[in-house]
């Protein structure tokens, strides 16, 4: 992928796709750079057991940007590694990319046992909204964790959104001249991501971190209707297996009580429709992350989706 090296062509295709699709130019540009780093990771995965996961993986799987998720989340397997080997593997998954320069703003980065966040800068060609409250453009954040359970994973075909929405003629040029197109990357399975998000929503809800809760509420509401998730729900053994991976992971998370917590005791599943603070943060989240009117999910709809989920979870053995 070298489209970004031809600044005129890069800006031109961003503008053309923006005009045809309505997707914001700054999002098309950042998504390209997110995908650039993922392409580099995909080339390492034969030797490096680091797997793409989370909200960005969810929407990359859908080849859409229903809710813009701008960071790269990775789970890094360190089974049978010494402490030194584990640290080096985590660093390789987060700190060693060559496609973009590491940031000089070290306050954006974090390095602790079992978790590293590295940040890579890019120079935006499109106009940046200086009023963007999250200030999320001009860099890509890569977060890798090794206390997580890195399974099950599967190869997933992904591509930059500007390729997804390009015309056939534009796609041919992107592939032939700039090596931009679909590729496969080992990714945590969507069924596992779904299970993770149920627990993540409860984790943040316990702590009244409602803006973070809101993102997971939205994602789970989207995923609940996916054919792949509906098939899992119909297969209780498989659903329990996915939930089990996450419960195992929670035994390794400091301060979490979710490894043994029954679904009947989940605060979130007790109902949140009358939580005014959560409703406010949910609406704020959508203003900042959901940019197409057709992708906006009313809070009351999300409440109903989670009521359906509650009934499903309470019937599990």
Tell me what each language-model feature is.
Residues 1-50, 62-66, 76-317:
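Structured mid-to-C-terminal alpha-helical surface segments
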Residues 52-56:
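Glycine-rich beta-strand-to-loop/alpha-helix junction loops that act as flexible
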């Amino acid at each position: 992928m070298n489209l970004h090296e031809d600044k005129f062509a890069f800006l031109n295709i961003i503008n053309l796709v923006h005009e045809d699709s309505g997707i914001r130019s700054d999002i098309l540009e950042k998504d390209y750079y997110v995908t650039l780093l993922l392409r580099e990771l995909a080339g390492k995965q034969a030797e490096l057991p680091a797997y793409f996961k989370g909200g960005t993986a969810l929407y990359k799987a859908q080849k859409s940007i229903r809710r813009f998720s701008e960071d790269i989340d990775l789970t890094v397997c360190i089974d049978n590694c010494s402490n030194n080997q584990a640290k080096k593997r985590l660093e390789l998954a987060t700190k060693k990319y060559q496609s973009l320069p590491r940031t000089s703003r070290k306050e954006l980065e974090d390095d602790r046992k079992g978790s590293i966040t590295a940040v890579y800068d890019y120079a935006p060609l499109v106009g940046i909204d200086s009023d963007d409250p999250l200030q999320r453009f001009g860099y890509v954040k890569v977060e890798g964790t090794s206390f997580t359970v890195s399974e099950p994973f599967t190869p997933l075909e992904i591509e930059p959104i500007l390729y997804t929405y390009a015309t056939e003629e534009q796609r041919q040029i992107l592939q032939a001249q700039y090596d931009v197109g679909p590729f496969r990357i080992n990714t945590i399975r969507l069924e596992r991501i779904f299970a993770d998000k149920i627990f993540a929503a409860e984790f943040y809800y316990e702590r009244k971190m409602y803006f973070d809760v809101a993102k997971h509420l939205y994602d789970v509401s989207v995923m609940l209707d996916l054919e792949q998730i509906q098939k899992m729900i119909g297969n209780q053994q498989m659903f329990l297996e996915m939930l089990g991976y996450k419960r195992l992971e929670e035994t390794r998370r400091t301060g979490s009580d979710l490894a043994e917590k029954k679904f009947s005791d989940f605060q979130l599943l007790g109902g949140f429709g009358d939580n005014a603070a959560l409703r406010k943060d949910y609406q704020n989240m959508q203003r900042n992350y959901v940019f197409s009117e057709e992708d906006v999910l009313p809070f009351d709809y999300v409440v109903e989706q989670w009521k359906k989920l509650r009934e499903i979870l309470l019937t599990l053995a």
